Amino acid sequence: MSQTPSSLCDLEHHSAFVERHIGPNDAEIAQMLEVVGHASLDALTDAIVPGNIKSPAPLALPEAITEEEALVKIRAIADKNTVYRNFIGQGYYGTHTPKVILRNILENPAWYTAYTPYQAEISQGRMEALINFQTLCADLTGMQIANASLLDEATAAAEAMTLAKRSAKSRSDIFFVHDAVHPQTLELLRTRAEPLDIMLRVGTPEEALQAECFGVLLQYPDSFGHIGDHAALADAVHAQGGLVAVATDLLALTLIAAPGQWGADIVVGNSQRFGVPFGFGGPHAAFMACRDAYKRSMPGRLIGVSIDAAGNPAYRLTLQTREQHIRREKATSNICTAQVLLAVMASMYAVYHGPDGLTRIARRTHRLAAILAAALRGAGVTVGEHFFDTLHVKAIDADAIHARARAAGINLRAIDSEAVGISLDETTTRADVVALAQLFGAMADVDALDAATADALPQGLLRSSAFLTHPVFNTHHSEHELLRYMRSLADKDLAMDRTMIPLGSCTMKLNATAEMIPVTWPEFGAIHPLAPAEQSAGYAQLIDELEAMLVECTGYDAVSLQPNSGAQGEYAGLLAIRAYHRSRGEAHRDICLIPESAHGTNPASAQMCGMTVVVTKCDANGNVDVDDIRAKAEKYSDRLAALMITYPSTHGVFEEDVVAICEAVHAHGGQVYTDGANMNALVGVAKPGKWGSDVSHLNLHKTFCIPHGGGGPGVGPCAVKSHLAPFLPRAGLHAGEGQTAAIHGGGFNSGSGSGHSSRIGGMVSAAAYGSASILPISWMYVTMMGSAGLRKATQVALLNANYIAKRLAPHYKTLYTGRNGLVAHECILDVRPLEKTSGIGAEDIAKRLIDFGFHAPTLSFPVAGTLMVEPTESESQHELDRFIDAMIQIREEIRAIEDGRLDREDNPLKHAPHTATQVSASEWTHAYPRELAAFPLPSLKQQKYWPPVARVDNVYGDKNVMCACIPVDAYKIPVDAYKEDAEA
């Protein structure tokens, strides 16, 4: 050990987290640099990144601090938020998160570090949880099918509008909106409708009877608590060839008639009150349920039931051809990331409580609301007659009531000068009812009122149908049972707590525990998104500081944190471009150039903005074809709105001509949109806002360490240059703005952050700051890494990708390389030649990797028949070598097929993955040994992941669509009988 004295500064080791986040240590980095042929990280960076885009100076951010120091700083920020008792409602309600779910789902990396379940065989656990969610939503709404989550209720309502437009027989362009929908829903509908030339008409349900429209949106119960009977309206809309969409409350539906019973075609809502905190607006799992006839037009992911190679039931993503990554500009939606982790929490909440427990919670909530209403009426206060949990209190001095409430630490909903709203929930107590009554000068003897007060639900709309009858909702009601059920599901899956997930273009990096800790603090979780601004001063500081960090990292001038996914960030950026052109009298600019290699969300988002997509070519080296871009920019010069590019490219290279590309587009009046999906190769090295790009979205769930959660949540900030800043999404309604302001399009606040007051763009998320409660994760990451740490992380991401490419070069060709034969942060392995010589394709390799305990790389994107590998900076040399060894062994197995030592059909790749049941069966029918199937490398005998199912049959799953909980008997009957049952 060295005896050299160390300074106190050295011993304080402020950069300790940097060494925890970055996988390889300095000695390993030196070894890996030797393999790739460069002397230092700076030399490697210079060899990869074009000189004309490199940043001349370090990031102007503070240097790194320790985890403990960062937690102290963010605790001080959190303490500036003030937690009041919230009765605001408006789509957000208090709830108790069962501690067993908090600890074993939300705080469990087996759940929050998983990726979207594209690889079905290693995703069976979370897909079972999601199919429980789908069953929950379909059962309560009375619909036939539900999806696996959407971003928020307002977004879901907008998706319902476009689904109705696609599917209705009516050719009308009018969509009728109930004037008692939640205000944030109406605002987002306005954003979505205008670029698509959809006319919104807002009014009462009675007025809807006179409208010739392709669809209506009703709120049930409505935003003020009223429960209306809309059956006649539904019949009238159907008679005109329109569809009926309903925004609803899942808890209320345990007591009132399901929308499907009285004529709804599409039902949307938010599952937030099923165990997920306010979180200043998110993240929460919304949902869409609909009639079976519309399933192929639904947005978002659908979990379906198929069978595996052994004939056993198995889950998979079904009907993927609807989605943006396949249909691109023809997709039903740009939805990509949704809210899987929150959907899992909501589903487990339903599993834990079961139908009886949910009904009890609903009845208790309603009972307290009825008692409060009776107390208020006894004091001469006017309240609504029929309601579930929300009272519309009228004919009062609202300002005086709010003043008393604030003095008592209570928030009520502001409606207008003579009315307030009071929404009760699972957390409401008897003492709360007494305190609320006192605000109005009323006395509440809860027991006496309980004995004397009838329920306030309309008798003609009481629920009569059963729900959640499947055993999964009627079994796991003790904590032990739920704990073991959740553990059994987690054990079926591969997440980053077990292995690297080398998905190209997905950036599956470390989600550090210290980053996650503040998410569960009540100072962040218990703030209602419409609470008065003075109660969210901590959030204001957090948002300002995080926006400033992102501005510095990107070189742009302004950032909006409202988009709650990358796709929504894209949409916000393109809307800003569209609004900018219109502000200059150039509304005719509607052409969006998009390279053929682009992410599928790019063209899907462009068409949602009313743009016409023109695809540009890529050259033989994987670069965007600059000449083709120039030619098409000139051809469409008068109409050119934007070019969308990804940088580094989706082909894993830094293109040399990005500056020239930006100049060419600007010369013809267009704007440049740089997709920030690959920002992990740029932070601290280059800034898109400085090389000519006008706007980017970022993925905080990639580059800035928010976990993927199995398919969400995410945050997709939109960053822009100053000329586009006014057109970023506005922050939403004041806490004190009522329904009238929303209906007439007024009443927008200045938001928490600097410069937000001048923003006039349409809202793209229900809440002003989207998924605000997970923003502390990215703040913590940047704060703990510091300027130098962020740059080093980028450099090691480049090193790790090139190390893999170099070591695998004798075995697999890297399809595209950039300058000096190097890749960016990911590499595409071309396995197409192997299919010609052995019959083994990319999917076979992906499935065989499961036998080695690995999640597959990105399959057949952006080039069919290839594998795209992105290791990120967080994987150690040991883990990289483990993956490389697996890929080399797979190449040896392919060589054995080529040489005739393994059969072309009966080989371990064609039959991968292998389950424990298969390899331990008394009969083994394959021509290769069991040991090769199960333990292709000796190290696997020490630690082995066993997939729960064999290879899943995708074709069968799409032909036999079943998206609800599997009947228990399906696990017992022969496969042929199961097929017949599914087909029936």
Swiss-Prot record:
Gene3D superfamilies assigned to the protein according to its UniProt record, in alphabetical order: Aspartate Aminotransferase, domain 1 (3.90.1150.10), Type I PLP-dependent aspartate aminotransferase-like (Major domain) (3.40.640.10)
GO molecular function, a single term: glycine binding
GO cellular component annotations of the record: cytosol; glycine cleavage complex
GO biological process, one term: glycine decarboxylation via glycine cleavage system
Primary enzyme class: oxidoreductase
InterPro entries: GcvP (IPR003437), GDC-P_C (IPR049316), GDC-P_N (IPR049315), GDC_P (IPR020581), PyrdxlP-dep_Trfase (IPR015424), PyrdxlP-dep_Trfase_major (IPR015421), PyrdxlP-dep_Trfase_small (IPR015422)
Catalyzed reactions: N(6)-[(R)-lipoyl]-L-lysyl-[glycine-cleavage complex H protein] + glycine + H(+) = N(6)-[(R)-S(8)-aminomethyldihydrolipoyl]-L-lysyl-[glycine-cleavage complex H protein] + CO2
Organism superkingdom: Bacteria
Pfam families attached to this UniProt entry: GcvP2_C, GDC-P
The keyword Lyase belongs to this UniProt entry's keyword annotation: no
Keywords: Oxidoreductase, Pyridoxal phosphate
Listed cofactors: pyridoxal 5'-phosphate
Residue positions where N6-(pyridoxal phosphate)lysine is found in the record: K702
KW Oxidoreductase (keyword) present: yes
The enzyme's E.C. designation: 1.4.4.2
Family per record: Belongs to the GcvP family.
Function comment: The glycine cleavage system catalyzes the degradation of glycine. The P protein binds the alpha-amino group of glycine through its pyridoxal phosphate cofactor; CO(2) is released and the remaining methylamine moiety is then transferred to the lipoamide cofactor of the H protein.
Oligomer status and interactors: The glycine cleavage system is composed of four proteins: P, T, L and H.
The protein's name: Glycine dehydrogenase (decarboxylating)
Naturally occurring in which organism (per UniProt): Xanthomonas oryzae pv. oryzae (strain MAFF 311018)
